[in-house]
């Protein structure tokens, strides 16, 4: 059995051009990265759980059960709970998440998802500042500047640069990579930084200070000289980065957990979103987060 245009269930890139051919206990995958291929291989894996399992009275062992019994047992546990927590994974559909939220409301439960331990601060930053965003297709067709801030997509989201942001030919970026400039903001010299046109190697946990300095420069003022010592980034590098951002036709910033997990948390994200809003007085600029799980963004939308 062959299927085409399957959405990959791994990372937030949500590549929708995957081809899968299932034959008995073997599966062949095309167009997916290594992470995507490994995920699809789980379908035929020997350790895949294929039926409900019930643990009786705290026993170590579990026993197989029919779906009807498992659903009834689950309902009994939820009905008896005083304050249940419904933690919805980020690898299921928006429709299933919506049902889960209705269930949580009916039970008076707490509903949560992977955002709490992932890009939760980024979502809070959006609530504080708002977000100027665009679809991946718009960035592919229009963007001539990509800024990767606190993320290393060549390892964590392998097809982002090749399918959406840097290498593909777009309507106004006919030459692909040759029509684009790439900036990496990362304390480490990652593989993404090595393949960028400009690497801003700031000190760990100084994202907020660097973002604030860029905002100050954007407003036509000079930041305090101490910002160079604090961030480890020279004022000339900040000015070079800002000129590239102001001079592009359509810029895209992609933030990762480097912003959400460092000192400042949601205030880092808020500053990044405010910077993008201010950049739109000079050119067209958008910002988005590179999410880890395939539908972790879906829960935030629901």
Question: Which ranges hold each PLM region?
Answer:
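A charged, amphipathic alpha-helical module
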Residues: 222-262, 266, 274
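Active-site-proximal structural scaffolding
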Residues: 96, 139-140, 175, 246, ...
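Internal, well-ordered alpha-helical segments in soluble enzyme and binding-protein domains
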Residues: 139, 206-210, 237, 241, ...
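Residue-level signal for secondary-structure boundary elements
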Residues: 112, 119, 222-227, 283-287
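A glycine-rich, hydrophobic/aromatic-adjacent loop/helix-cap motif
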Residues: 260-302
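Intrinsically disordered or highly flexible coil/loop and linker segments, enriched in small
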Residues: 83, 152, 250-254, 281-285
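N-terminal export/assembly segments and adjacent metallocofactor-ligating motifs
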Residues: 1-221, 232, 257
